[in-house]
A protein has these predicted regions:
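Short beta->alpha junction loops/turns
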Residues: 1, 17-21, 133
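Flexible, glycine/proline-enriched loop segments at strand-loop-helix junctions
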Residues: 13-21, 84-88
């Protein structure tokens, strides 16, 4: 933006998202298929369909596509009742995401993300953590508060970290171990602020390895499921990996 005069002139602010990882289009197709919509006919999808009388994390997915050659729109039950929606499983994640260490879009003028904190998760509408790095935007937000068109609570740095604690573990300790594995195999990896390390319990190491395998296999097995025309095939292939991953959370501390 600084180097391109047109961008510098026209783009006044950059807004960033707190990101867990990026999904491929197969993530949307997986939702559609479970709702009875042909996966390659999706016309529109809302990944965060708010469901009243639920918590912020119990949102649904709304998909518009074809069922029996008829255009239809369907809304799911809370996503935690659907297969493959646990974000920690990393289904359909891009490999590049495993080497990203930027959680809060650090170069953005303003960053927003889910406020996964006990005091906010009961609101089904959801609540955002907002990190402001630009004085003009900070003044706009303050004006909104004074005019009562915006509600903001001041929270601590520790609260921000807690709201994304799993993300920080994956992008710090997890990244350190992924760098260690890459270096052990002699593979190139981008330079990172985190140093490679294997100093963690074996079952935590296994968890990080299984996350990589879950991401990798999800792409392959879903494509095979599309060819076979069977979503059950995808479930059958992924379930053993999911169970192995979940078992890493049953180890003694």
């Amino acid at each position: 933006m600084i180097e391109d005069e047109i961008f510098h002139e026209r783009i006044k602010f950059c807004i960033g998202l707190i990101c867990g990882h990026l999904k491929s289009t197969q993530f949307a197709e997986m939702f559609a298929w479970q709702l009875g919509i042909e996966p390659k006919t999706i016309e529109k999808i809302d990944f965060r369909k708010k469901l009243p009388a639920t918590s912020a994390s119990a949102y649904g997915v709304e998909v518009t596509g074809k069922e029996n050659n008829q255009l239809t729109t369907k809304t799911s039950s809370p996503v935690n009742e659907m297969f493959g929606t646990n974000w920690g499983l990393g289904f359909f994640k891009y490999k590049a995401c495993d080497y990203c260490d930027d959680i809060t879009a650090e170069t953005a003028d303003l960053t927003v993300g889910d406020a996964w904190l006990p005091q906010y998760v009961k609101d089904h509408r959801g609540t955002n953590v907002v990190v402001v790095r630009n004085e003009i935007l900070a003044e706009i937000l303050l004006k909104g508060v004074l005019e009562q068109s915006l509600h903001l609570d001041s929270i601590t740095l520790q609260d921000v970290i807690q709201s994304q604690d799993a993300n920080y573990r994956h992008r710090r300790a997890g990244l350190a171990y992924r760098l260690y594995l890459a270096e052990k195999k002699g593979d190139w990896h981008p330079p990172k602020r985190v140093r490679s390390s294997s100093s963690m319990l074996p079952w935590i190491q296994k968890r990080f390895v299984l996350r990589m395998e879950l991401a990798d296999k999800s792409h392959t097995f879903f494509q095979e499921a599309l060819v076979s025309g069977s979503f059950s095939y995808f479930v059958e292939k992924m379930t053993p990996l999911i169970e192995s991953y979940q078992n890493t959370y049953n180890q003694p501390l």
